[in-house]
Every structure is written in C-alpha cells, then in structure tokens.
Amino acid sequence: MASRPNAASVEAEAAAALARLRSALDAAFATVPHSAAPSESQSADFARLMRAALTQAAAEDTLLTPAQCEGAANGYRRHLLIADPQGRYAAAALVWQPGQASPVHGHRTWCGYAVLDGALRETLYAWDEATEHAQPLRTQAREAGAVSYVRAGLNAIHRLANDGARPAVSLHVYGVAGEHIATGVNRLVTARH
C-alpha cells in the first residue's frame, strides 16, 4: 500500500513548483528590461514566454496544496500564490464551484491563465464602441491544460464559467502587484445577449 505524502512534503513540493513558475515569469520579464509592461515591439516574445510559463505550471501535479484548491460557496475564490517583490506580476489560483462564473470583463493589465483541473467555459465578446456594450462572439470549452494570454484593453473581453458538475481550478497571472489582484485587473463591462 502506497503511503500518502505528509503535509510538510506537500507544502515543500508546492513551494518548489511555485519557485519554478516564478523563475519562468521572471525570465519573461528579462525580455522587457526597465519596464513592468511589455511594449508593442516586445509583446510577442513576452506573450510566448508567459504562455510557456503557464503551460509548464499546468503540467505540475504538485503546484497547489489542498488548501489552495478550496473553493467558496458565494463565488469563485482566489488564492494568491506569488506576489512579485517588484510589483510586476501576481499569480493566483482561482477555484470555481459548479455554476460559478466571472462577470463579463476586459482587462486593465495583461493577463494569462491556464486551466489546472476540471473545465471552464469561456465566452468571448467584441466591444461595440457605438453602444458601449460587449457583443457575444463565441463560446469555447477550456479543458485542463488550456492556456490563454491577452494584453490589456477591451480587445479580449470574456467571461469564464464552470458549467460542470465538479469544481474547476485555474491559474491566473496578472500584471499587477499582489495587493491589487482583486481590484486592479478586471474592467467590468455591460454585455448584450
């Protein structure tokens, strides 16, 4: 019979996996010296490296502790995992119970996410300047391992939802300091359905 890992070893494995994620995120920022946000000319390399960091993290079975996979009944729950000491980025695990969804939103900063466990439904929207509303474009399933990265603005309005019967967990990295992860990321918009 295989023994279950003790809490200390689970914590140590998660810390090591998060250290690898931090290292990969820092490597992405090495492509944008002297700036907390990539310029247009730097964004392709930065985006590629962010996607690679998220893909690598999604493959880590030990990235999160059991406590970091706990949800909440009243809405999706964020667990802050990494707050860059220079304020360039913050990473969080979001836990989605069945039926929970984000509001329709664009972003005040660049962001990327990876689905770690379960599945999410992502609805993409186009911004209509004339009506100042978001118009639904398409919906796509985002299974475990799916990765996305977008720049700031209203060019990537979306809504994530857990339509499944079990919880889902996703990893999000945002271009904000850790203390701004709840207020400095999403730009809520009104959608027409």
Regions found by a protein language model. Name each.
Residues 112-114, 165-181:
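A short hydrophobic beta-strand segment most commonly corresponding to one strand
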Residues 109-125:
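Glycine- and acidic-residue-biased ligand/ion/polar-headgroup-sensing regions
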Residues 183-186:
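Mixed-charge, glycine-accented linear interaction segment located at domain edges/termini
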